[in-house]
Amino acid sequence: MAEPRIFTSPDELRSAVGEELGPSDWLEIDQKRIDLFADATGDHQWIHVDPEKAAAGPFGTTIAHGYLTLSLLPSFTPQLLRVEGVRMGINYGVNKVRFPSPSRSAPGCAPPAGSWRRPRSRTVSR
């Protein structure tokens, strides 16, 4: 497992604004995960859930929903950072989120061919 950067206080975390954290461990985004997310959100667009049609589409395979990719952030955070003396964290929100490249579902692909993600994070001020 990736080793998180340990901050001794929220102030120390704030002083790290602009620094890169990570990378995390690799995470496979497979078709089963994509299908479960589609069922949970009701977003069954063919680029996500129809492998046959998606094979002839612009990405050559199905792709993960952008919001699926975003929803994985809580699972990566403990791999990237920990702040001592903090009992819990909450999602305050996100600004200027973009999805510049798709997360492809491609069984048997080795990282980083598209079915895997290994995030890095950059601390920013609010």
Report the location of each language-model feature.
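HotDog/MaoC-like acyl-thioester-processing domains
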Residues: M1-A16, F99-R126
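Catalytic strand-loop segment that frames the active site of acyl-thioester-processing enzymes
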Residues: A2-A64, L81
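Glycine-centered flexibility motif
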Residues: S9, G18, G66, S75, ...
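Predominant activation on well-ordered alpha-helical scaffold segments within soluble catalytic domains
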Residues: D35-A38, L70-P74
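Hydrophobic beta-strand-centered segment that forms part of the acyl-chain substrate-binding groove
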Residues: A55-T61, S71-R117
